[in-house]
From Swiss-Prot:
One Pfam short name: Macro
PROSITE patterns, per database record: MACRO
InterPro entries noted in UniProt: Macro_dom, Macro_dom-like
Descriptive protein name: Uncharacterized protein PH1513
Protein's organism: Pyrococcus horikoshii (strain ATCC 700860 / DSM 12428 / JCM 9974 / NBRC 100139 / OT-3)
PANTHER family reported in the protein's UniProt record: GANGLIOSIDE INDUCED DIFFERENTIATION ASSOCIATED PROTEIN 2-RELATED (PTHR11106), MACRO DOMAIN-CONTAINING PROTEIN (PTHR11106:SF27)
Domain Macro: 1-185
Amino acid sequence: MITMFKIVRGDITKFRAEAIVNAANKYLEHGGGVAYAIAKAASGDVSEYTRISKEEMRRQLGKDWIEHGEVVVTPPMKLKENGVKYVIHTVGPYCGGVWSKDKEEKLKLAILGALKKADELGVKSIAFPAISAGIYGCPLKEVVRTFKEVVKEFLKVANHVKEVYLVLYSERDYKLALETIGLGDNDESR
């Protein structure tokens, strides 16, 4: 079976994958960035989607916060129109522009947690935003390198997940990501 990791340019709220990942904060507040966009697209009402997310967090984890590597799954609601079956919330590290081995390990946990949950749910395709590269301030190049490394290893052992997408909204970020993994100006995957 062919497996693939692909970097694409687009809007994750309109991306066609069985699961999309939300780069959430530890309390699932969905107050800004991609978390706000996903909540708005899923429900139309961010506060309602936040309420649903918090209820699911308490039900699934038995607490009111997520640690690095933990995930919460919520229904896709309106995102179902794009073929989305699940929204998987994970928490990446806050960098504030400073990258370290500790931040890398926390990001690996966040990515791997979402991938494992998707595999457990029988998902074949999953789309990620650049976790921690936005308002959390981690360098995009480091985030992309970490994604590539984690996904490459995970796809060797995955039972169901066959397609992993890193969806970048801006053309600038998309081009930088392709350059980072040595693809230049094309959209091939490695």
